[in-house]
Every structure is written in C-alpha cells, then in structure tokens.
C-alpha cells in the first residue's frame, strides 16, 4: 500500500476493508465474513498509552456549552437548558503525539477559527438508557482533545436557523492525544483544564465545573442513541474560546494527562 499516496493522509487513520464494526447491531466484520469490497475504506484508530494496541473509533459525539461561563458567553442560560450533542465525522481525528508540536492546517471557508480544549471519554462498552450510577462502567479511558470550530460559519448557519455542522465537522477538526486506560488514571472528576496560545493562558477551569458530568453525559446520550464500543465523547469546553491564526501554537493541559500541542499552519 506504500505506493498509494492517498492512503493514511491523516494521522490516526489506517487502511481497512469493508465495513467495520465493533459488533454493532445489524453490522458485521466484513473480513470475518469473507466479504469482498470494490475499494479499501479508511478506518480510524487512536494509540493507547503504554500499549501496542490502538483504540478503534466508531463515532465522535460532542456536548455543547457544558461549562456555565462558556454557555453564558455563547448566549445560553446554563441553569435551565438541557444538554445537547452533535457529531463530527470519525476521520476528523488528528492524532497528536505527546511532547511534540504537530502542524494543524487552517481550514478553508473561515476567517474566525476557534479553539476549544476538552476532556475526551472513550467507551469500550455500550447500551441504551444507561443509569448515571452505571455510566462510568462504559469508559475505557480518557484523552485530551480539541474541538476546533469555524465559528463564523457556525454562527452564520445558526442565525439562519440551519444546522451548523459545517462549523464543527470538517477535516482535522478533532485533534486528540493518546487514550489512557481508566485502570491507570482513574476517572477524571476534577482537576485543572487549560489552554494557552503562544504561552498566554486563554482558557482555565476545573473539570468539576462541568454542568453535566461525564457520567451524566453518557446517561443522557444513551437515551437518544444506543452507544457502542468505540464511541468517544468530547465533554465540553470552558469559557474564553477564541480565534487563532497561522503561526499560533496552542498548548492544552489537563492534570494527569500529557500536554497536547499544535501549530496552526
């Protein structure tokens, strides 16, 4: 496959054949069934820290406005609005190795490109209507991530009462570090989360300030969608989101996880 220059065009994407699929209802492992397909399909994996194994990504869920101050700066009332979720395409993943500054391309169609640092939960179990007190049993591990956003497109579509997927779902819009198993880190209930641009702190909060905890997010999300192994959940960003331009270096931090750094190019 080395002669195919289009293969592995993004970090964390590997070549797979046929449909994948983690045992999801109605789906099968194509290679196990001997199914032949007319072309290869890229599959997305995230390295697991301290292991030669990789985490297969099924879906990327994101929660919106999950810190009170961020909800207010985005024009919402955090005291009364229920949680809402959106998705990014699986191949929006851009893996960012620890202790490196990875180039991140400034996307097309935008003049107002924003950062949002987030804790990411990775699931190895699934279910529907999961009670809050059982929800963390589904979590395999955690990672540090960024929900990169074309804010001008998001706002333009929102003002027109149209879906704002174009502002959130695009190539490389989900940078993420390695996944650390819960067995090594425990669950991230509290701890510092922050982001700096060119050494200046822009976002800083505590994970305990989430409006909806990771367990509550899993429970609420499972009411609307059956969850499966391989699903990951971006758990929301603190206040003070803002723009970056080419040449800026973003550094993300969560206590207990290695830093994540990208350079906008």
Predicted features and spans:
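Hydrophobic, well-structured mid-protein blocks that either form specific transmembrane helices
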Residues: 129-163
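Boundary at the C-terminal end of the N-terminal hydrophobic targeting segment
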Residues: 28-30
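Extended, compositionally biased flexible segments
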Residues: 33-134
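Short, structured patches in soluble enzyme cores that scaffold and shape functional sites
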Residues: 117-119, 123-125, 143-148, 180, ...
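N-terminal secretory signal peptides and thylakoid transit peptides that target proteins
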Residues: 2-20
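A generic structural signal for short beta-strands and their flanking turns/coil linkers
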Residues: 80-82, 89, 115-119, 138-144, ...
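Catalytic-pocket segment enriched in acidic/His residues
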Residues: 32-54, 97-98, 151-265
């Amino acid at each position: 496959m080395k002669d195919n220059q289009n293969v592995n065009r993004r970090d964390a994407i590997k070549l797979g054949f046929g449909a994948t699929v983690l045992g999801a209802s109605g789906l099968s492992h194509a290679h196990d069934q001997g199914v032949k397909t007319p072309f290869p399909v890229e599959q997305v994996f995230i390295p697991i820290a301290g292991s030669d194994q990789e985490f297969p990504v099924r879906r990327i869920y994101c929660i919106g406005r999950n810190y009170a101050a961020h909800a207010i700066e985005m024009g919402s009332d955090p005291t009364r609005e229920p949680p809402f979720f959106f998705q990014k395409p699986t191949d929006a993943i851009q893996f960012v190795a620890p202790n490196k500054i990875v180039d991140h391309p400034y996307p097309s169609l935008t003049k107002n490109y924003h950062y949002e640092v987030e804790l990411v939960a990775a699931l190895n179990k699934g279910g529907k209507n999961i009670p809050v007190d059982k929800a963390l049993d589904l979590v395999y591990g955690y990672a540090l991530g960024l929900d990169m956003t074309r804010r001008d497109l998001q706002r333009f579509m929102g003002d027109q009462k149209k879906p704002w997927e174009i502002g959130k779902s695009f190539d490389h819009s989900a940078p993420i570090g390695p996944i650390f198993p819960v067995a090594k880190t425990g669950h991230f209930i509290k701890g510092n989360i922050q982001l700096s641009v060119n050494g200046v702190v822009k976002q800083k909060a505590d994970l305990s300030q989430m409006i909806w905890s990771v367990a509550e997010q899993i429970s609420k999300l499972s009411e609307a969608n059956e969850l499966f192994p391989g699903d990951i959940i971006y758990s929301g960003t603190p206040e003070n989101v803002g723009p970056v331009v080419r040449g800026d270096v973003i550094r993300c931090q969560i206590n207990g996880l290695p830093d994540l750094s990208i350079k906008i190019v």
